[in-house]
């Protein structure tokens, strides 16, 4: 458990779970507006650490029901698996994040919407460097 008394929260941003996949490999027989959780469970998956936490905190599924081919430490690694056409990637993202890979689709999984947030934090009493403050200011303007 994290000792929250030691940290200042600078910014929080809501995140949702998204399925990322190659349109020319998965679900080629239909439009890509929605995907069901049952569809996802039938596919080989690449999961980021964040998506594993989101899935484990939900009551929708047991991790053993999923065909997880790769569990990665970063979103970008999970997305790379999907861009190769080998897996459907499940990653937490905010609404404004984009996928800049050709032939890729990104669909929000509404079953996993809600109480998931990412946070920018610092140790209490520690000032940000000018570069870090510039990044936070840029990010706040972006969201």
Roles of regions detected by a PLM:
Residues 27-29, 33-37, 41-64, 128-132, ...:
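Secondary-structure junction motif
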Residues 15, 42-43, 84-85, 102, ...:
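Structured helix-beta-strand junction loops
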Residues 1, 23, 51-52, 92-95, ...:
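Short secondary-structure boundary segments
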Residues 10, 38, 79-80:
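Alpha-helical segments flanking ligand/cofactor-binding loops in enzyme cores
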Residues 1-17, 21, 105-107:
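Short beta-strand-centered segments that line the small-molecule binding cleft or hinge
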Residues 50-107:
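Hydrophobic hinge/microswitch elements
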Residues 106-143:
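A late-sequence structural motif
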Residues 10, 18-20, 26, 88, ...:
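Residues embedded in well-ordered beta-strands
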